[in-house]
Amino acid sequence: MGVKKGIEEGVDFILAVGGGKHYRCGESIAHGTANPGVSLWDIWTKKESLTKTLKVGAVLTISAAGSETSDSAVLTNEAIGKKLGLGTELNRPVFAIMNPELTYTLPKYQIGCGIADIMMHTLERYFIPDQKNRMTDEIAEGLLRTVIDSGRMAMKRSDDYDA
């Protein structure tokens, strides 16, 4: 629906507002709109090359996995029950606004989900076998300590800018 509307309206920029899933959706719409007639699934399965996309901006309203800083994207083909990743610099936004004040009104449950998401994505990389890099591990450990401490603060007061 988003790609079709983007093509019909001649969209030349996508502004994704929300969390990582909103950003990923905007990214996919940008790829599809810039490549009319090409199946997104064919791009993800590498049957078609992705050589152009629309510019995408991100306004984050939740702290979580950091999708807006990654070159990775995912697409789910519900018809066949598959989910694939796609890594390309074309997945990066032209800007990302990450203002903690935009998260102040989140319910505690959602704040907790964001804390867990940050920790789990950090641990995924931390426990990759056969990739020994002490400095990267130390950064991950520091991030986990910070998220635990700041997470406790945010759970007590969601409008604490220092959290």
Regions found by a protein language model. Give the residues of each.
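Glycine/threonine-rich beta-strand-loop-alpha-helix active-site module
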Residues: 4-98
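Carboxylate- and glycine-rich phosphate/diphosphate-binding segment that chelates Mg2+/Mn2+
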Residues: 72-163
